[in-house]
A protein has these predicted regions:
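Short alpha-helical transmembrane segments in multi-pass integral membrane proteins
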Residues: 1-21, 78-143, 184-226
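Small-residue-rich hydrophobic transmembrane alpha-helices
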Residues: 52-110, 114-116, 147-166
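Hydrophobic faces of transmembrane alpha-helices in multi-pass small-molecule transporters and flippases
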Residues: 5-36, 41, 62, 66, ...
Length: 226
């Protein structure tokens, strides 16, 4: 290693920014979801709903940290297999990533249902917020199952130089389906089904992500040399 002047390369910077765009969009999904949920809960449930969702928000942050950890751990495996032009290994690691993510999210879902009251007590929730949280966790938490797989599919796509496809998945997921589902489902049910909205959005996003992935691999994975 040695210290040397670095020559600015606009093309390289542009490529780095382009490759990193899907990850940025993925990271923005959670705050967009939280914002939309809070605005909707204020309208239909009130302060107690927002207090309850603040607790659920902590759980979401923890769960999504697990998903992101798995997806980031899979990136070098995807990248190495792509660089070796080994389609068999690529699909093997994709299946493994989906299984690990789905299994982990299922464990998290089971734990938060079983320990909902304990978790609320840890965060000092009052009685109304605890009651709402305990009732809402099973309705909202199943979104983790599909969110985990969406995260892996996005990671798989941008790790194999399918930046546009990965960006499309994250835009659909975080900026179209989630806000629309929260607003529309809440409006139709007068707020009664608001807790199911994110799960529905993640399910639709997963179906779209699968379609985009399979379409991009029609005829096999296309390997790029650049």
């Amino acid at each position: 290693l040695r210290i040397a002047p670095v020559k600015f390369d606009a093309a390289l910077v542009g490529k780095i920014l382009t490759r990193g765009l899907p990850e940025m969009l993925s990271q923005l999904t959670t705050p967009v979801t939280i914002l939309c949920m809070n605005l909707t809960l204020i309208k239909y449930i009130g302060d107690d709903g927002v207090n309850a969702y603040s607790i659920i928000g902590y759980i979401i942050s923890f769960a999504y940290a697990i998903f992101m950890g798995v997806s980031e751990g899979m990136q070098p495996l995807f990248g190495r297999s792509y660089g070796d032009q080994n389609e068999e290994d690529l699909h093997y690691f994709l299946r493994a990533g989906v299984i690990v993510s789905f299994g982990g999210s299922a464990v998290v879902y089971g734990l938060i249902i079983a320990l909902g009251g304990v978790i609320c007590a840890m965060f000092g929730a009052d009685a109304p917020a605890t009651a709402i949280s305990v009732a809402a966790i099973p309705r909202h938490g199943w979104a983790f199952l599909f969110a985990s797989m969406n995260t892996i599919l996005s990671s798989y796509l941008y790790s194999t130089k399918r930046t546009r496809e990965s960006a499309a998945v994250n835009i659909l997921r975080g900026f179209i389906f989630t806000p629309l589902c929260i607003v529309l489902i809440s409006a139709v049910s007068s707020g009664a089904a608001v807790w199911y909205a994110v799960g529905v959005a993640e399910l639709i996003s997963f179906l779209c992500a699968m379609f985009i992935t399979r379409r991009s691999e029609r005829g096999g994975v296309r390997f790029s040399e650049d």
